Amino acid sequence: MKQNKTKLVIAVLLIAFLFTGCIGVDRSFRNMRDYVLSYSGNEFEKEFEFSFGSISIGMAELVLDFAETEEPIDEILSEIDNVQVGIYNNLSSSKVKSSLEELKFITNKMESAGWDCIVRSVNKDEMTAIFLKYNEETLNQLFVISVNNDEVALVEILGNLNKVIEIAIREKGLDFAMKH
């Protein structure tokens, strides 16, 4: 009897580990990562790269149920299906190019894959771009690319982002603090 319980516990832990969604990023994310990193011509080292699926996000929601917060974090998380993040450190002695030319190449690549660019910024040694993708009328994907001399950061969020925006506006209104 005790041996069966031990096997059951091990099986449950193994299943929980395998299906939490905390795994490597998907092919489209890797393709964009490879494109951005190779364009600079520099050598990069992966600091971290991961993906949280719906089960991992659901587990985070359960933990947040016990946290005392007035923020609607659990409600927002319930609308998110997947989050992919990658941080890559520049190992080269040369600086990463953050130019308008590079931004145009990245934007063209993303637009050819069905993304709409909503923010593009090049400022001295830093470049940032934010892209959206829609499924019919619903905003369901957000992709952020940030490049500076030291690192490249990529973030992709999938889910019902219309609902996430609705929750944010409901809770905070349109009174967003702006840095001048």
Identify the function of each model-found stretch.
Residues 18-21:
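C-terminal motif of bacterial Sec signal peptides marking the signal peptidase cleavage site
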Residues 163-180:
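A recognition module on extended beta-rich or small alphabeta surfaces enriched in W/G with H and D/E
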Residues 131-162:
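A short, solvent-exposed beta-edge/loop patch
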Residues 28-102:
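Early exported N-terminus immediately downstream of N-terminal targeting peptides
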Residues 104-132:
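Short Gly/Thr-rich strand-loop-strand
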Residues 45-47, 78-82, 123-125, 138-140, ...:
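Extracytoplasmic
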Residues 23-26:
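Bacterial signal peptide processing site
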Residues 2-10:
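Bacterial N-terminal signal peptides that target proteins for export
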